[in-house]
From Swiss-Prot:
Name of the protein described by the UniProt record: Leiomodin-2
Entry keyword annotation includes Acetylation: no
Region of interest (Disordered), ranges: 91-166, 179-200, 358-455, 469-534
GO MF annotations, alphabetized: actin binding; actin monomer binding; tropomyosin binding
Residue stretches of biased makeup (Basic residues): 479-489
UniProt entry tagged with the keyword Cytoplasm: yes
Spans annotated as Interaction with actin 1: 1-164
Protein family per UniProt: Belongs to the tropomodulin family.
Composition skew (Pro residues), residue ranges: 420-452
């Protein structure tokens, strides 16, 4: 009955016209109906994360322009690329202002502002784009004028002093020409400070090269580390200049994209130069060919003590490592090698080579010190002897004098003439009369005979040796065996007693505790031992008893 009643309730909606109902609905009711239908039957083409209905009721403030957003991103990326290429470290104040205005404009376009404000911002953005295009054209004109001035054709006089951006661009170009070493002139920039590389290395390449060529006494180290825009030809020029230099001690060009050509130029320099003690070519593009060229050059170099070539782009390989060890076997001056050998064999042999070199350097240093001491000692020998002869001052204070005067002993000199007459001694008293015999004391008892005691142990080693020698002589003279045995046992017993007396009490206790207990023999064992030790000659005939006959 329930199902029939439900169908009966639905039958009344069959005669209703749907179009009339939809036409009678308002706009808000239609939106609500669409939301309900979306929840009931979502669009299958949309991903699952986007099928839910939007819960935000904020009205859009303006039309979204994808082209404007793409243009803004392209412009920002171009600016970043230019800054990286020019090596600009800090931002100028005007650029900061312009970028902040552009960011404000871009954010305000997406904020809750009316459409009228949005149109005004679009007009401002178009005006700023036109201004930037004009500034770009001015920068291009400045660059052309600067290049003409460098080539020596036109003088640089057409720059507007009010515009600070072209000036900064000009200074950046001049700094690049100075650091890269590609410009032919010697123009200096007086308006801007010294050029700074993006890597942070403040070395000016052209100045450093000139100092090396002029053999400047202040430049003992050439540091070209992390300069990426330096060319292989420039590195070769440095190597050529260092051939005749006598001041530079350290030459480092880590992370400069140096290749085998630069390594071969450095090898040629090491064959000639006798003053450089440290070379660093780590983190470059040098292969095994360039490294082996440097190792062959070290066979003719007796000054270099440190070489670093680890972390190259190409792997050296086992063959190159073994060849390095072979080439460095004859070298006796290299003390530090900056490379991690992959194979254990070359690694251990290289460690032994470096240890040998360090030991030789230590011996050489000690020998030089001895020679210096010998030269100094010959000159100051007399002074040393004189110093030994003179008494040195005592570190202790002198003893204080006693407040009491010491007693004076009068010396009496007795002579024969001045000797006074000696007084006459009185006569001795007469002896007492003898006592009667019954009054005499009893005589003392006779002394007891000495007890036969043990012989005292003498610790005189000389006496023991004499006794041993006498015993040996007695044996050699052909005395009887019994007598020889007794004499032989006597020194042995004395030696044992000496050893026991010299031992400590703890050692004796340890010996007694560690010594096993002597086993007690039975009567049967004694009988069997006597039978074993007897012979037929010792046996005697015994009559057989009558009971056994």
């Amino acid at each position: 009955m329930s199902t029939f009643g439900y169908r009966r309730g639905l039958s009344k909606y069959e005669s209703i016209d749907e179009d009339e109902l939809l036409a009678s609905l308002t706009a808000e009711e239609l939106k609500e109906l669409e939301r309900e239908l979306e929840d009931i039957e979502p669009d299958r083409n949309l991903p699952v994360g986007l099928r839910q209905k939007s819960l935000t009721e904020k009205t859009p403030t303006g039309n979204f322009s994808r082209e404007a957003l793409m243009a803004y991103w392209e412009k920002e990326s171009q600016k970043l690329l230019e800054k990286e290429r020019l090596g600009e470290c800090g931002k100028l104040a005007e650029e900061d202002k312009e970028e902040s205005e552009e960011e404000l404009i871009f954010t305000e376009s997406n904020s809750e502002v009316s459409e009228e404000v949005c149109t005004e911002e679009e007009e401002e953005s178009t005006e700023e784009e036109e201004e930037e295009e004009e500034e770009d054209s001015e920068e291009e004109e400045v660059t052309t004028e600067v290049t003409k001035h460098i080539n020596g054709t036109v003088s640089h006089n057409g720059v507007n002093p009010d515009n600070s951006k072209p000036k900064t661009f000009k200074s950046q170009i001049e700094n690049i020409n100075l650091t890269n070493g590609n410009s032919g002139g010697t123009q200096r920039n007086t308006e801007s400070p010294a050029a700074i590389h993006p890597c942070g290395n403040p070395t000016v390449i052209e100045d450093a090269l000139e100092k090396i060529k002029n053999n400047d006494p202040d430049t003992t180290e050439v540091n070209l580390n992390n300069i990426e825009n330096i060319t292989t030809q420039t590195l070769s020029r440095f190597a050529e200049a260092l051939k005749e230099n006598t001041v530079v001690k350290t030459f480092s060009l880590a992370n400069t994209h140096a290749d085998d050509a630069a390594a071969i130029a450095i090898a040629e320099m090491l064959k000639v130069n006798e003053h450089i003690t440290s070379v660093n070519v780590e983190s470059n593009f040098i292969t095994g060919k360039g490294i082996l060229a440097i190792m062959r050059a070290l066979q003719h170099n007796t000054v270099l003590t440190e070489l670093r070539f680890h972390n190259q782009r190409h792997i050296m390989g086992s063959q190159v490592e073994m060849e390095i060890v072979k080439l460095l076997k004859e070298n006796t001056t290299l003390l530090r090698l900056g490379y991690h050998f992959e194979l254990p064999g070359p690694r251990m042999s290289m460690t032994s080579i470096l240890t040998r070199n360090m030991d030789k350097q230590r011996q050489k240093r000690m020998q030089e010190q001895k020679q210096q001491e010998g030269h100094d000692g010959g000159a100051t020998l007399r002074t040393k002897v004189w110093q030994r002869g003179t008494p040195g001052s005592s570190p202790y204070a002198s003893p204080r004098q006693s407040p009491w005067s010491s007693p004076k002993v009068s010396k009496k000199v007795h002579t024969g003439r001045s000797r006074p007459p000696s007084p006459v001694a009185p006569p001795p008293p007469p002896p007492p009369p003898p006592l009667p015999p019954h009054m005499l004391p009893p005589p003392p008892p006779p002394p007891a005979p000495p007890l036969p005691g043990k012989k005292l142990i003498t610790r005189n080693i000389a006496e023991v040796i004499k006794q041993q020698e006498s015993a040996q002589r007695a044996l050699q003279n052909g005395q009887r065996k019994k007598k020889g045995k007794k004499v032989k046992k006597q020194p042995n017993n004395i030696l044992k007693e000496i050893k026991n007396s010299l031992r400590s009490v703890q050692e004796k206790k340890m010996e007694e505790s560690s010594r096993p207990s002597t086993p007690q023999r039975s009567a049967h064992e004694n009988l069997m031992e006597a039978i074993r030790g007897s012979s037929i000659r010792q046996l005697r005939r015994v009559e057989v008893p009558e009971a056994l006959r």
